[in-house]
From Swiss-Prot:
Gene behind the chain: pdxJ
Main function: Catalyzes the complicated ring closure reaction between the two acyclic compounds 1-deoxy-D-xylulose-5-phosphate (DXP) and 3-amino-2-oxopropyl phosphate (1-amino-acetone-3-phosphate or AAP) to form pyridoxine 5'-phosphate (PNP) and inorganic phosphate.
Keywords: Cytoplasm, Pyridoxine biosynthesis, Transferase
Keyword Transcription found: no
Single GO BP term: pyridoxine biosynthetic process
Reaction(s) catalysed by this chain's protein: 3-amino-2-oxopropyl phosphate + 1-deoxy-D-xylulose 5-phosphate = pyridoxine 5'-phosphate + phosphate + 2 H2O + H(+)
EC number: 2.6.99.2
Site keyed Transition state stabilizer: positions: E156
Organism per entry: Pseudomonas syringae pv. syringae (strain B728a)
Protein name according to UniProt: Pyridoxine 5'-phosphate synthase
Main location group: cytoplasm
Catalytic-site annotation from UniProt: H48, E75, H196
Chain residues that bind 3-amino-2-oxopropyl phosphate: N12, R23, G197, G218, H219
InterPro entries in UniProt: Aldolase_TIM, PyrdxlP_synth_PdxJ, Pyridoxine-5'_phos_synth
């Protein structure tokens, strides 16, 4: 995984599938959303196949792998079932994430430092089939250093604490935490991505952090698309982050 010379936008389409699964219909189609996102300037498409299959389904992943013109960033938990599925479909990019059944969304970063042997085995297993692996972690030096030790070429820093911060002081502290994590990750030789909870009113400060390779954004795009359409929502976000990163 190489570091891009410009900031990239990864569009997460999970919540298009959430809307579909709410009624068990065939619409809206997350695959169509992915193709529209690509046309609007998305640099990649992110999907999370959860253990409980609450949104994205196996069929979505298989279709996306066949039709995407950019690339698929496949998010998955570190389970035997998901590792076996990944070995079957061989996505080029995989992001390992923590997962619990009761959570509304991914609530924190993967504890790499607390389970190095398990994560290292998964990274090595996926690397053998040609997958470039990133780890979704908190912006914490201990976790970043552990990610380097287990052999992951990339990390995605969890920006949820920044997104949830309420006061100006808290926002500044959490933004600095992300910036410090980016700098430490780069010093370790890692490609550094970021995401979670980012939207049109808070993304620019993160995009302006030097060294971030890609921002992965989903819920805010799907929500804004209700009013402006999906292509317009993606194009607007892409313009925001590119301008902020200059």
């Amino acid at each position: 995984m190489t570091h891009s010379t410009r900031i990239l936008l990864g569009v997460n389409i999970d919540h298009v599938a959430t809307l579909r699964q709410a009624r068990g219909t065939r619409y809206p189609d997350p695959v169509k959303a992915a193709l529209d996102a690509e046309e609007a300037g998305a640099d990649g498409i992110t999907v999370h196949l959860r253990e409980d299959r609450r949104h994205i389904q196996e069929r979505d992943v298989l279709l996306l792998k066949d039709v995407l013109q950019t690339r698929m960033n496949f998010e998955m938990g570190v389970t035997e079932d998901m590792l076996a599925f990944a070995e079957r479909i061989r996505p080029a990019h995989i992001c390992l994430v923590p997962e619990t059944r009761q959570e509304l969304t991914t609530e924190g970063g993967l504890d790499v430092a607390g389970q190095e042997a398990r994560i290292k085995a998964a990274v090595e297993r996926l690397a053998k089939i040609g997958c470039e692996v990133s780890l979704f972690i908190d912006a914490d030096e201990r976790q970043i250093a552990a990610s380097k030790r287990v052999g992951a070429p990339a990390i995605e820093l969890h920006t949820g604490r920044y997104a949830d911060a309420q006061t100006p002081t808290e926002v500044a502290e959490e933004l600095q935490r992300v910036a410090d994590g980016v700098a430490f990750g780069l010093a370790q030789g890692l490609v550094v991505n970021a995401g979670h909870g980012l939207h049109y009113h808070n993304v620019e400060a993160v995009a302006a952090i030097k060294g971030i390779n890609e921002l992965n954004i989903g819920h805010a795009l799907v929500a804004h698309a209700l009013f402006v359409g999906f292509k317009a929502a993606v194009a607007e976000m892409k313009a925001l982050i590119v301008a902020a990163a200059r």
